[in-house]
Amino acid sequence: AFNVGSMFRDPDNALLPNWKHIPVGYHGRSSSIVASGEPIFRPKGQQKLNDQENPIFGPTKLLDFELEMGFITFDGKSLGEHITTDEADHYIFGMCLFNDWSARDIQKWEYVPLGPFLAKNFASSMSCWIVPLDALEPFRTNGPIQAPKILPYLEYKGDKHIDINLSVSIETPNGEEKTVCNSNYKHM
């Protein structure tokens, strides 16, 4: 979030005031989820170049991804009924790797004032493997201390984070595998 905020604003104002208080999410299209390994097309959209007054239309030049985890859920509650943080695990079947693709130049132009739309809804890659939540129990751990203190409806008890090492590698044009990011889900 800090890196993207720095791209769109500046490092001193990278995270907006609500960042530490609201769980951030985007509503994507289920029709744009593809299996891991499927080709991703380069989306077209409006972009605002720094040296031009008006936007242009064309293919993104800043295609990016975000390493994420997907949650596969059971049936939820009735429309309008709240699932508490204590109940959440009862509604989750399992987890999978999930890469959210982003067209950053399109996103930069369209995200104010309503947030990204076309820049983030064109593709998401989902692993073909789902790991049941029960299988991840031995890897439960404490998460980072949240500061500032979060609102009561977001508070939780116990080990809700999961210690999963994550990495992303890409294949270079000459066929070499290059690791481009490493993380751990317990920090997410």
Task: Pin down the residues of each PLM region.
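Extended C-terminal subregions enriched in glycine
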Residues: 183-188
